[in-house]
Regions:
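Short, aromatic/His-centered strand-loop micro-motif at the edge of beta-sheets
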Residues: 134-161
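Extracytoplasmic low-complexity segments
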Residues: 1, 13-71, 114-116, 231-247
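Sequence context surrounding c-type heme c attachment/ligation sites in exported
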Residues: 247-290, 303-308, 312-331, 643, ...
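Extracellular glycan-interaction patches encoded by glycine-rich segments
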Residues: 187, 195-216, 220-224
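Localized edge beta-strand/strand-to-loop motifs within extracellular or lumenal beta-rich domains
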Residues: 158-173
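Glycan-recognition/cleft segments
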Residues: 51, 109-136
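Short surface loop/edge beta-strand patches of beta-sandwich-type extracellular domains
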Residues: 16-18, 67-92, 113-114, 144-154, ...
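Aromatic- and Gly/Pro-enriched helix-to-coil junctions and flexible linker segments
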Residues: 14-19, 217, 224, 228-437, ...
Length: 860
């Protein structure tokens, strides 16, 4: 096959950008001097390549021409690249090259990850007028034979874009200048890849397969790029500026974002942000911070000693009424100013740093109670709901959700409960019928049982069972047989053991690596996807997709997510998020004062919860509206009892749908009893304001200093809740913090502690529902004239929309988000918003993001 190098670009291209997902090493030969070829990857630096004989090469910006015999190799084994591809089982090798001549053979090594002429993990080489790729698997030779070659006369001395991809299922393809040139199935997996091999260009490690020509770009991915991605990289051109280079922060920017901004957020923004501006100084925004206070500039770049900010911090005058900065924190601040005070963020958002103390910890995820119940039912078709809720300890909330991994501990009560439940589950199963799905044999022989255990375990434990695990479960059947038991007994006891296995009760993942982010394997990804979308284990279709390697293709993942979102379990999972986010369990414990609310009907608490769930399903699933419209959608669901409580004209029986387009005071989550009751009997402006501040605006406020009297002030004739709040805001000791959140509740003032609407309170005080809202990060507040206008402002706010993205993402991951996640969450939000901002689009964006596709590895 003859492939002509048509429209090949050397210089930077503007029509397309290169794909970077899964990129493990990129060499673009930007440097024109030296003996080291510098590399980069998505996680930082890739291993450098040392040129053994610099006289044999000519370097210029964007290219490296090999004119004589040399070897360009890593000085150590390419461990990160090797381990990453061992895990993924996939690869893409990409090069922009110009061969110097046609008669190079051996094959002559263009790119190789190998030891010598007969031992390799892979090699891209030249054999005369063809390209040849050798890729080692458990089904090939140690030399990567059989190989894949392009057709005769496909290699020329023109600039050529050559790409080799190999999927986990074994499908290997060779592309030349964006077009498919050859394909072949290379069976086996990469578990036998040698960890000691080095990456090299222009020769074999044994220096006996030299190649001459010019390199413009070399890239290695741990996944197989799709044909569209290969074409995209081709059209980007040989000299395309990579997204990695464009987006990587400078050392100064990195220091500001990882050290200085968190320091300012922690110690300074309580008094010096857009809402307080104490002393006329706002340190939350770049323009205002560098402009200074009403007394002048406080930061003099390059001169900490004369910067008022540093002087006040160094003297422990600031922060006021709070502990001073530590010696290390002071050093960071001083050094930052002296080095030029680089300020790379337009706005410092304290919310993204709130949980950074947990940033370096990987928590193994135990199944929550809801997930355990769903997993049992999906795996063995047994409904264990009632018994599980009675026997298992409840999951406790932490950081706003009950599925927070670090709080999902296992104690002796859990161990005993899981053992009891496993026995109950197996007693309800038709064990023989269940085993028949995996083996028709009823023998207790080693061959029969090992095959059954392997196949059954793959389903029950959500992935392949290792030999040592098979040995362990096989020991159970051996013990049963020696005691006179039969096949049914053996399978029953094996199932009980599997149902108590950490692999069943936890979402176990391989986290060993180099400390960077590595891709999860196909079965780990399948479990992540299913528990995010369904709160349940992968079904057979998803496991099949994992087994066939279809989940390492973004289109394959999106296809599965789209299918999964059509399943009723996706709706159930979304309502679990809603239930957890709004803490709807509160309604089970709602006990209003009978003196204040003599007409309270305890059944209203359940009605309020059902209202919110039905409303959520209507907006999110029936109308498929953007999540932010949960704040102002003019519809609700109510029983006759709840409708009367709200003062609505009665509709149908049971839980009926109500159109609120003519009821301006109601519409959206904040006007529903399940949320309004967060303020307690007194309809507290503090707790309601904090709810809006924390859960809708992602605002941050510290606890009050020691010694501050926090006793609630009661209302009375002439003193409403708003008047009390206004006095607090004006108080020097309280106002700096309370001004951030209490005004957020003013628009809810006409709703009493149980959500009923009134124009006056119980003392006859007029209730106003107008006010102002200052969105975090904004320079100026926005006024509203009624609760309805407030709801519209919230629904239209980018801050609220992004907060919902953060909340759903946190629930999906089962952990608080940290500053290292912020850029990825921003991209998730942008992708979801471009697709309509719906729940479905958000879930799809989360699942296809690096937060789900990769894991943070540990070095021990």
């Amino acid at each position: 096959m003859l492939v002509l190098p048509v429209s090949v670009a050397i210089g930077p291209a503007h029509a397309a950008s290169r794909t970077t997902r899964g990129l493990q090493a990129l060499y673009d030969f930007r440097s024109s001097t030296g003996s080291i070829v510098v590399g980069q990857s998505r996680s930082g630096a890739a291993p450098g390549l040392k040129i053994s004989d610099t006289k044999a090469v000519t370097r210029s910006e964007g290219s490296l021409a090999v004119r004589g015999k040399t070897l360009i190799r890593t000085q150590k084994p390419a461990t990160t690249i090797i381990e990453s591809i061992r895990r993924s089982g996939e690869i893409t090798i990409e090069a922009w090259i110009q061969p110097a001549k046609i008669d190079q053979s051996g094959p002559a090594r263009i790119i190789t990850l190998s030891k010598n002429s007969s031992e390799r993990n892979f090699t891209l080489g030249q054999n005369g007028d063809r390209f040849e790729v050798r890729f080692r698997t458990t089904k090939t030779s140690g030399n990567g034979i059989p190989s894949l070659s392009s057709g005769p006369k496909s290699l020329t001395t023109e600039l050529t874009h050559v790409v080799y991809t190999r999927s986990r299922s074994g499908q290997a393809r060779l592309y030349l200048n964006g077009e498919a040139a050859a394909e072949q199935t290379i069976k086996g997996d990469t578990s036998n890849w040698n960890r000691s091999h080095r990456l090299a260009l222009a020769n074999e490690l044994s220096k006996d397969r030299p190649w001459q020509g010019t390199y413009h770009l070399v890239a290695i991915y741990n996944r197989d790029l799709s044909a569209a991605e290969v074409e995209r990289n081709f059209h980007a051109g040989a000299g395309a500026e990579t997204t990695l280079a464009q987006n990587r922060p400078t050392p100064g920017e990195h220091r500001f974002e990882t050290e200085v901004a968190p320091l300012l957020a922690k110690h300074c923004l309580e008094c010096h942000d857009s809402s307080t501006v104490k002393g006329g100084l706002d340190l939350s925004r770049r323009d205002t911070a560098l402009a200074g206070s009403k007394h002048g500039k406080v930061i003099l770049p390059g001169n900490a000693a004369e910067s008022p900010l540093w002087e006040s911090v160094d003297a422990n005058d600031m922060p006021d009424d709070r502990p001073p900065l530590s010696a290390q924190e002071k050093k960071i601040l001083q050094q930052w100013i002296d080095e030029g005070a680089t300020w790379s963020l337009e706005t410092i958002d304290p919310a993204i740093y709130t949980h950074d103390r947990q940033a370096g910890t990987n928590w193994v995820r135990r199944l929550t109670l809801e997930e355990y119940i769903a997993t049992v039912e999906s795996t063995v078709d047994v409904d264990i709901d009632q018994e599980a809720r009675e026997i298992l300890p409840p999951d406790l909330r932490a950081d706003g959700f009950s599925n927070t991994a670090y709080n999902l501990i296992v104690d002796l009560k859990h161990v005993e409960a899981y053992a009891r439940l496993a026995e109950i589950i197996v007693s309800r199963m038709d064990v023989i019928d269940f085993a028949a799905e995996y083996s028709q044999s009823r023998k207790l022989t080693d061959k029969s049982m090992r095959g059954l255990i392997s196949k059954m375990g793959n389903w029950v434990l959500r992935g392949p069972v290792e030999d040592r695990e098979v040995d362990s479960y096989r020991g159970i059947s051996t013990t049963v047989a020696s005691a006179g038991g039969n096949f049914k007994d053996a399978v029953g006891f094996i199932l009980e053991a599997m149902l108590q296995s950490p692999r069943f009760l936890y979402r176990m993942e391989n986290q060993r690596g180099d400390g960077g982010r590595w891709p999860v394997d196909e079965y780990e990804l399948a479990s992540r996807m299913s528990y995010i979308v369904w709160g349940a284990p992968p079904d057979r279709e998803l496991l099949k997709a994992a087994e066939e390697g279809r989940l390492f293709d973004s289109a394959g993942v999106e296809t599965q997510v789209e299918r999964m979102l059509e399943d009723p379990r996706a709706i159930e999972r979304s309502t679990q998020f809603l239930h957890d986010w709004l803490d709807l369990d509160r309604m089970d414990h709602l006990r209003p004062s009978p003196e204040r609310f003599p007409n309270w009907d305890p059944n209203l608490a359940s009605d309020m919860r059902e209202e919110t769930i039905a409303f959520f399903k209507e907006v999110v699933w029936e109308q498929k509206r953007p999540l932010s419209e949960l704040l102002n959608a003019q519809v609700t669901y109510a029983t006759p009892r709840l409708a009367a409580h709200y003062g609505l004209q009665l509709g149908g029986d049971g839980l009926a749908r109500y159109d609120l387009s003519t009821v301006p005071s109601r519409g959206g989550l904040l006007t529903q009893g399940s949320v309004l009751t967060v303020g307690g009997d007194d309809a507290s402006t503090v707790t309601r304001g904090l709810f809006v501040f924390h859960d809708l605006l992602r605002g941050v406020v510290k606890d009050p200093p020691p010694g501050i009297d926090t006793t609630p002030v009661p209302t009375r004739p002439g003193l409403s809740q708003r008047a009390i709040a206004t006095e607090r805001i004006a108080n020097r000791s309280c106002g700096a913090c309370h001004s951030k959140f209490e005004p957020l509740s003013f628009g809810l003032a006409r709703f009493d502690g149980l959500g009923a609407y009134h124009a006056v309170d119980e003392h006859g005080n007029d209730l106003r529902d107008d006010g102002e809202i200052l969105f975090p990060g904004a320079a100026k507040p926005v006024s509203y004239g009624s609760s309805g206008e407030l709801m519209d402002l919230l629904a239209g706010s980018e801050r609220v929309s992004k907060t919902l993205t953060w909340k759903v993402t946190q629930f999906a991951l089962g952990r608080p988000l940290v500053s290292a996640d912020a850029r990825i969450v921003d991209s998730i939000h942008a992708k979801a918003r471009a697709a309509g901002g719906t729940y479905a689009s958000l879930i799809s964006a989360i699942v296809t993001s690096d937060l789900v596709q990769t894991t943070r590895t540990e070095t021990h």
